[in-house]
């Protein structure tokens, strides 16, 4: 029970530090971008791997803490390619793929 409480507390503080307007990352409101991809490893017998990484280190820590209780695996980033319509400073505000600002 102590470990569960400690895990929840760590995940909560990681999420709080990843959110809010104080952290400056790429894309919307300074939250950073976290992308997920499920890699099946070329067969049905293998456990799928959840891949995730962020432009913001605290957001990556929050994603790792949150996903470790659900599905363990390797973490890495996959970007979404798109174009920007208005060339906003914090990333695209429209266009194909939504523009993650990378």
Swiss-Prot record:
Could you say which residues form the signal peptide?
1-18
Cellular component terms per the entry's GO annotation:
extracellular region
Its function, per the record, reads: Chorion membrane (egg shell) protein; plays a role in protecting the egg from the environment.
Family affiliation = Belongs to the chorion protein S15/S18 family.
Annotated compartments: Secreted
Q: What is its main location?
A: secreted
Does the keyword Signal feature in the UniProt annotation? yes
* Organism of this sequence: Drosophila grimshawi (Hawaiian fruit fly)
Q: Which UniProt keywords apply?
A: Secreted, Signal
Q: What is the lineage of its organism?
A: Eukaryota, Metazoa, Ecdysozoa, Arthropoda, Hexapoda
Spell out the protein name for this chain: Chorion protein S15
């Amino acid at each position: 029970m102590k470990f569960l409480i400690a895990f929840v507390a760590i995940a909560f503080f990681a999420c709080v530090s990843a959110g809010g307007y104080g952290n400056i990352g790429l894309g919307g409101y300074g939250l950073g971008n976290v992308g997920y991809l499920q890699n099946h490893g070329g067969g049905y017998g293998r456990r799928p791997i959840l891949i995730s990484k962020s432009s913001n280190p605290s957001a990556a820590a929050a994603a790792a803490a949150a996903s470790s209780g659900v599905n363990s695996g390797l973490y890495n980033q996959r970007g979404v390619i798109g174009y920007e319509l208005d060339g906003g400073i914090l990333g695209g505000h429209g266009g194909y793929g939504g523009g993650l600002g990378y």
